[in-house]
């Protein structure tokens, strides 16, 4: 329905954005926009290769494996190999829904601040498009940097401090500059969502698996992968959770609470 409106539509997927982080950002946008909020359930595992592909394709991961069987053939759960077809997924979704755009779909992935600044300077040309889909990786980078760099651990030692860090980043970001420019665009509609959030993990748990077991910290898959049932959800039949099978003997485990 949003695409039936006369103005441009911007679909922003902010990678790894938690709801409390959105509330921090939203307080700066209320005076510029009319804000409507809706909620929907995420999928498990709540990780980019599964969740973001599901958003752009309109399919569960098991359906993506069936319709696009080569996607999960590499066995690598990284953003490049697993999420490089997002534009094609969205085009196919619009085609299935019989949505006719007034112009070609524009897809942009912002992976560094410099590219974000370039996009802000190009807003005047982007507003001429009917639908522009934008993936913003800054919040995901913030979450990973929080774990990797001691200085950020000191700056954001708890959730309250993490929200404060989010606020500082957002108010000085190219993303906020983009919002301010779009607020001056007549009839512009912005749909903001996320593929997943983040959890501050404090408790480790032992995992048993072979050398082919995936290396992800919050979920793993492989042949007969095991973990303490108190610490992880064990999925022996991936199809029940609409997950790709990846072979006859593959099972998944997904960490609970703040375990990793």
PLM region spans:
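Feature captures the catalytic ectodomains and active-site-proximal regions of enzymes
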Residues: 1-260
